[in-house]
Amino acid sequence: MAGLTAAAPRPGVLLLLLSILHPSRPGGVPGAIPGGVPGGVFYPGAGLGALGGGALGPGGKPLKPVPGGLAGAGLGAGLGAFPAVTFPGALVPGGVADAAAAYKAAKAGAGLGGVPGVGGLGVSAGAVVPQPGAGVKPGKVPGVGLPGVYPGGVLPGARFPGVGVLPGVPTGAGVKPKAPGVGGAFAGIPGVGPFGGPQPGVPLGYPIKAPKLPGGYGLPYTTGKLPYGYGPGGVAGAAGKAGYPTGTGVGPQAAAAAAAKAAAKFGAGAAGVLPGVGGAGVPGVPGAIPGIGGIAGVGTPAAAAAAAAAAKAAKYGAAAGLVPGGPGFGPGVVGVPGAGVPGVGVPGAGIPVVPGAGIPGAAVPGVVSPEAAAKAAAKAAKYGARPGVGVGGIPTYGVGAGGFPGFGVGVGGIPGVAGVPGVGGVPGVGGVPGVGISPEAQAAAAAKAAKYGAAGAGVLGGLVPGAPGAVPGVPGTGGVPGVGTPAAAAAKAAAKAAQFGLVPGVGVAPGVGVAPGVGVAPGVGLAPGVGVAPGVGVAPGVGVAPGIGPGGVAAAAKSAAKVAAKAQLRAAAGLGAGIPGLGVGVGVPGLGVGAGVPGLGVGAGVPGFGAGADEGVRRSLSPELREGDPSSSQHLPSTPSSPRVPGALAAAKAAKYGAAVPGVLGGLGALGGVGIPGGVVGAGPAAAAAAAKAAAKAAQFGLVGAAGLGGLGVGGLGVPGVGGLGGIPPAAAAKAAKYGAAGLGGVLGGAGQFPLGGVAARPGFGLSPIFPGGACLGKACGRKRK
């Protein structure tokens, strides 16, 4: 003892002596309970900690480390972990109580003490945080025993970067995380500075340092630190976001999940929107308090479905009728919801059965369940209801009960009169009101009819060849043009006839006989005329004049056709004229029986005029026409002008538009015979069309006349022709002249003067290419006129 007292002022000597001293056991071993006084001399490591003073504070707790430290760095628990019965001489009797106390102390964290420190040297590198004792099993939470993503502890709480959750540190929303290096509870602990310190998952002082994986193992919730402590002062980096880890049962996510689970189990708790619970509890009757805690009514599911359908119908527009959901006051019929069974006494007023249906099976709304009816009503309201009057059920197009709004006549509605889910369901008396087709359908039909042409009553029957009427081509009654001829064929025939000229006449084809004229073909004989061929003398094309052989000189024919057209527009026809070739004895060149210029009827004359033309007509022509006219003033004296009768002009107009114009002057010509001039429609539509087509084709390729005897005819007058190739108007004549019509003129006109011959166009050729059928007279001889 003297040695120890003398060595006390010298710490080095004291340390040396303490290291070589051996414990003596005069009175036993230190007690099992911390704070017990050991027997004998000082035991190494006991220091001041075993006496409850020195390094121990009040209650046996170690003092907080400060710069300079206090003497004694151990935990101060002593070596009291062994039961007293082990070594005799213990102050406290050994036994079961001591063993239990030792186990409890070990479990509480007393455990074995740390390595003893040297007094007066401050805090050593010994453990600071109490560790689990020998009786504690490895922790189940990651971070205790095995390094994990987040620190150990019972539950994650407020974090201390680099330290983790410490035992005994309160957790909750009021604790804020502390960043190292900026102060706080762990600002002065070695290894917990701004450089990062121990990594998450390793409590302070743990003997094993596990490396930290960058990014927190890729989990969404970490401490928010960059790997290995990188980052400004421990501020949360890109490795993750700070917060409670998932799957631990705490934090806002867990709270939200728990709330959702509770809401799903017990209901949302909000006030119900759908009616059905208030009042006396009758299903379907609107109550004072709609719904109970979010439970939509207590009635049948039909109420909810009907309410949803009503909401949808209100959104897109309710079907016309009573106000949806209003009290049913609209008309109802017995058996239809709202008046009979079901109706009065159905949900809300009497027997609380199915809403809007009354006694099941005894009423109409058809066979459809309320759910289906409500769904159908919503769909109809969404896409637009079809107007009609029905009784209920699925759409029908007839008359009867049951049916979603139909097009027939019915009574009921969808299913009832009142509201949803009131007394009658979706209100209405006739479904969606209306009897006819919807405006949309009518508009679509009108548009289609306008696009393709609506069938309606024709204005006029039309003058399709062979069919009575006035305006050609206008559809008749019901859109069928004419009477007998199909519209398409008749219109086509009319157009073609108008192009080439109609063949007016009276017989089967224009004229009187089978074809123009009376005979088989033009005239009566083999070909135009009655005898051998037109005229009497040598006909053009046989020997002298062109026409029968090569078809004439094309250029001359064209010029003659133009002159004929001009003359025709300025001339006025005599009696029996009309469209060229219609009167008896008048026709297209070379068709009459008599002689003269080709195609003249009784008497001579320039083609195209009947016998009634006079000097006044001739004098109305242009000088160029009078110069080549054999019946001009060189042969006839001036005579008073007789009234001009428009014939050819109307014929030209008729030929242009193809319409059969009634003859201006029918009846007898002076010498022209008895024709039925102008526009008398043929006997049959098909024959008229065929004749028009044949005439047009004949005019297109030119008529071939046969040779005849030119010359005088009978006294200059000739035998009256029996027809003429009627129906080929000037347009057809011009067409024939274009392709070269066979000239059928004689050598000269009649003998002497032309008796009352008309003056008109000059188709065909005689001796002279300038004036067909006549000699070269005057200064026009040899000249070509346009």
Swiss-Prot record:
Keywords on record: Disulfide bond, Extracellular matrix, Hydroxylation, Repeat, Secreted, Signal, Williams-Beuren syndrome
Record disease entry: Cutis laxa, autosomal dominant, 1: A connective tissue disorder characterized by loose, hyperextensible skin with decreased resilience and elasticity leading to a premature aged appearance. Face, hands, feet, joints, and torso may be differentially affected. Additional variable clinical features are gastrointestinal diverticula, hernia, and genital prolapse. Rare manifestations are pulmonary artery stenosis, aortic aneurysm, bronchiectasis, and emphysema.
Ranges where the record places region Disordered: 615-645
Modified residues (4-hydroxyproline): 116, 190, 283, 286, 327, 342, 347, 360, 415, 427, 481, 580, 589, 598, 607, 677
GO terms classed as biological process: animal organ morphogenesis; aortic valve morphogenesis; blood circulation; extracellular matrix assembly; outflow tract morphogenesis; regulation of actin filament polymerization; regulation of smooth muscle cell proliferation; respiratory gaseous exchange by respiratory system
PANTHER family in the record: ELASTIN
InterPro entries, A to Z: Tropoelastin
Reported function: Major structural protein of tissues such as aorta and nuchal ligament, which must expand rapidly and recover completely. Molecular determinant of the late arterial morphogenesis, stabilizing arterial structure by regulating proliferation and organization of vascular smooth muscle.
Subunit structure: The polymeric elastin chains are cross-linked together into an extensible 3D network. Forms a ternary complex with BGN and MFAP2. Interacts with MFAP2 via divalent cations (calcium > magnesium > manganese) in a dose-dependent and saturating manner. Interacts with FBLN5. Interacts with FBN1. Forms a ternary complex with FBN1 and FBLN2 or FBLN5. Interacts with MFAP4 in a Ca (2+)-dependent manner; this interaction promotes ELN self-assembly. Interacts with EFEMP2 with moderate affinity.
Residues the record lists as Allysine modifications: 104, 107, 241, 261, 265, 312, 315, 375, 379, 382, 448, 451, 492, 496, 558, 562, 566, 653, 656, 693, 697, 735, 738
Gene Ontology cellular component terms for the protein in this record: collagen-containing extracellular matrix; elastic fiber; extracellular matrix; extracellular region
Cysteine pairs bridged by disulfides in the record: C776-C781
Cell compartment(s), UniProt: Secreted, Extracellular space, Extracellular matrix
Protein name per Swiss-Prot or TrEMBL: Elastin
GO molecular function: extracellular matrix binding; extracellular matrix constituent conferring elasticity; extracellular matrix structural constituent
Low complexity: bias regions: 630-645
Signal peptide positions (record): 1-26
Modified-residue entries (Hydroxyproline), positions: 34, 65, 67, 88, 156, 167, 170, 177, 290, 352, 355, 421, 465, 522, 550, 646, 769, 772
PTM description: Elastin is formed through the cross-linking of its soluble precursor tropoelastin. Cross-linking is initiated through the action of lysyl oxidase on exposed lysines to form allysine. Subsequent spontaneous condensation reactions with other allysine or unmodified lysine residues result in various bi-, tri-, and tetrafunctional cross-links. The most abundant cross-links in mature elastin fibers are lysinonorleucine, allysine aldol, desmosine, and isodesmosine.
Family per record: Belongs to the elastin family.
Tissue specificity remark: Expressed within the outer myometrial smooth muscle and throughout the arteriolar tree of uterus (at protein level). Also expressed in the large arteries, lung and skin.
